C-alpha cells in the first residue's frame, strides 16, 4: 500500500544515496577525506535564486569530481537525476524566516534550502563525521551498510516470529469457519496480526531501499515471508465486513487500519469498530459467519471473478460448503468441471483445517 507523497520522495532519495551508487561513493570519499559538504540534489529557478557566487560547471557527475569540489568552500548543486554537477562553490542564501531546529550553519542552511525548494539537500559534517539528509520536511542521518543491515536482520527475525503466529491464528480461524463457530474476536485477531506483519514488512522495505545493492538477499527473504499476506489481508476484511453502509468498501477499511496508531492496534475492540462492528462490551464474543472469500481463494485455478459470483450467489461459507455440484453449476461461469473442482477443493480444505486444529 502506497504511503503519503512525502514518503515516496523520501524513499526515492534513499535509493539514490544507497550504498553501491556513484553518489554514495562520492559522499563516502568526502567523509574519508575529513571535509564537509553541502549538496543540493536538484536545480531549477528557485534554487538558482538562492545561489550567489561560485561558478557554473554543467559537467557529468563522478564520485571523484564531487570529492574534489567538496574541498572548496560553498555548496554544490546537482541536476535532479544526479547525472550532472551544475554549480560549485556556491553561497546559498535561503529565506532566514524559514524555521529550522538545527544549530550549525551548514545544517541550518541545508534544512532551509530543502524546505524552500522542495529538493533534497545533503549536509556532510566534518566534525561529527555524519551524512545528514534533509527531504520532505524531515532530517535523516545516513548510516553505514553494516549498521543498517544489523537493524534489518533484527526486524526480519521479528517478522518471522510474527508471521509464524499469524499462520497459527489464521489456521485456527479456518477451522472455526468450517465449524461455523467464528466470533468477532477470532476474525479481528487475524486482521490485527496481518496489519502488524504488514507494518514490520514496511520497515524492512525501507532498509532494503537504503541498503541498495547490499539489500538483495534481504529483499528475497522479505518477498518469501510476505507472499500472499496482502491478499489475505484484503480477503479477511471482505469476509467479515458487516452488511450496511460500509459493505463492499474494503479498501477504505484497510486504509483506516493502516492509519491506526500502534496503541489502538493492540485493542481488538477498536479494530472491530474500525471494520464496522458496533455494540457494547460483548462485541468481541458475538458469533459471525464468513462470506467465503478466504476459503475460495485457496481453491486452485479459481478466477477472482468466479469467486465474487459464488459469494454473491451463496452469501455465506456454510451455504457454499453445503452446496452440491448442481447447486454450484447454477452460478454464471461455473460449468460441471469447475463445479467439481470447487466442491472437491472445499472438501479438502475443510478436512485439512479440522485435522490441523485437532491432530
Curated annotation (Swiss-Prot):
UniProt catalytic activity: 2 ATP = 3',3'-c-di-AMP + 2 diphosphate
Residues that hold ATP according to the record: 74, 92, 105-109
EC nos: 2.7.7.85
Keyword Nucleotidyltransferase: yes
GO-annotated biological processes: DNA repair
Keywords, ordered alphabetically: ATP-binding, DNA damage, DNA repair, DNA-binding, Magnesium, Nucleotide-binding, Nucleotidyltransferase, Transferase
Lipoprotein keyword on record: no
UniProt GO molecular function: adenylate cyclase activity; ATP binding; diadenylate cyclase activity; DNA binding
A Pfam family the protein falls into: DisA-linker
Classification via InterPro entries: DisA, DisA_sf, DNA_integrity_DisA_N_sf, DNA_integrity_scan_DisA_link, DNA_integrity_scan_DisA_N, DNA_integrity_scanning_protein, RuvA_2-like
Enzyme class (EC, first level): transferase
Domain DAC: 7-145
Cofactor annotation: Mg(2+)
Listed HAMAP family: DisA
Task performed by this protein: Participates in a DNA-damage check-point that is active prior to asymmetric division when DNA is damaged. DisA forms globular foci that rapidly scan along the chromosomes during sporulation, searching for lesions. When a lesion is present, DisA pauses at the lesion site. This triggers a cellular response that culminates in a temporary block in sporulation initiation. Also has diadenylate cyclase activity, catalyzing the condensation of 2 ATP molecules into cyclic di-AMP (c-di-AMP). c-di-AMP acts as a signaling molecule that couples DNA integrity with progression of sporulation. The rise in c-di-AMP level generated by DisA while scanning the chromosome, operates as a positive signal that advances sporulation; upon encountering a lesion, the DisA focus arrests at the damaged site and halts c-di-AMP synthesis.
Quaternary data: Homooctamer.
Family (UniProt): Belongs to the DisA family.
Protein name per its UniProtKB record: DNA integrity scanning protein DisA
Species assigned in the record: Parafrankia sp. (strain EAN1pec)
Upper classification of the organism: Bacteria, Bacillati, Actinomycetota, Actinomycetes, Frankiales
Amino acid at each position: 500500500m502506497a504511503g503519503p507523497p512525502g514518503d515516496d520522495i523520501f524513499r526515492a532519495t534513499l535509493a539514490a544515496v544507497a550504498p553501491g551508487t556513484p553518489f554514495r561513493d562520492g559522499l563516502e570519499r568526502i567523509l574519508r577525506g575529513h571535509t564537509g559538504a553541502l549538496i543540493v540534489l536538484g536545480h531549477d529557478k528557485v534554487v538558482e535564486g538562492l545561489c550567489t557566487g561560485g561558478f557554473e560547471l554543467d559537467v557529468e557527475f563522478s564520485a571523484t569530481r564531487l570529492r574534489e569540489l567538496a574541498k572548496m568552500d560553498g555548496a554544490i548543486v546537482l541536476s535532479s537525476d544526479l547525472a550532472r554537477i551544475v554549480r560549485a562553490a556556491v553561497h546559498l542564501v535561503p529565506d532566514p524566516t524559514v524555521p529550522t531546529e538545527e544549530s550549525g550553519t551548514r545544517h541550518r542552511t541545508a534544512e532551509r534550502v530543502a524546505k524552500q525548494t522542495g529538493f533534497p539537500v545533503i549536509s556532510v559534517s566534518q566534525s561529527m563525521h555524519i551524512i545528514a539528509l534533509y527531504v520532505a520536511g524531515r532530517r535523516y542521518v545516513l548510516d553505514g551498510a553494516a549498521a543498517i543491515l544489523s537493524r534489518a536482520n533484527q526486524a526480519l527475525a521479528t517478522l518471522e516470529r510474527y508471521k509464524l503466529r499469524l499462520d497459527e491464528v489464521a489456521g485456527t480461524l479456518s477451522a472455526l469457519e468450517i465449524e461455523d463457530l467464528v466470533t468477532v474476536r477470532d476474525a479481528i485477531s487475524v486482521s490485527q496480526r496481518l496489519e502488524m506483519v504488514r507494518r514490520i514488512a514496511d520497515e524492512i522495505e525501507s532498509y532494503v531501499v537504503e541498503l541498495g545493492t547490499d539489500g538483495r538477499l534481504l529483499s528475497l527473504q522479505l518477498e518469501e515471508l510476505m507472499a500472499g499476506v496482502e491478499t489475505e489481508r484484503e480477503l479477511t476484511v471482505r469476509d467479515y465486513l458487516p452488511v450496511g453502509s460500509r459493505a463492499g468498501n474494503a479498501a477504505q477499511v484497510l486504509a483506516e487500519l493502516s492509519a491506526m496508531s500502534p496503541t489502538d492496534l493492540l485493542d481488538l475492540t477498536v479494530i472491530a469498530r474500525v471494520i464496522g462492528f458496533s455494540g457494547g462490551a460483548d462485541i468481541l464474543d458475538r458469533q459471525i459467519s464468513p462470506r467465503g472469500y478466504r476459503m475460495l481463494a485457496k481453491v486452485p485455478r479459481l478466477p477472482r471473478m468466479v469467486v465474487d459470483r459464488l459469494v454473491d450467489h451463496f452469501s455465506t461459507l456454510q451455504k457454499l460448503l453445503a452446496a452440491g455440484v448442481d447447486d454450484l453449476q447454477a452460478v454464471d461461469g461455473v460449468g460441471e468441471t469447475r463445479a467439481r473442482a470447487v466442491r472437491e477443493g472445499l472438501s479438502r480444505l475443510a478436512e485439512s483445517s479440522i485435522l490441523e486444529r485437532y491432530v
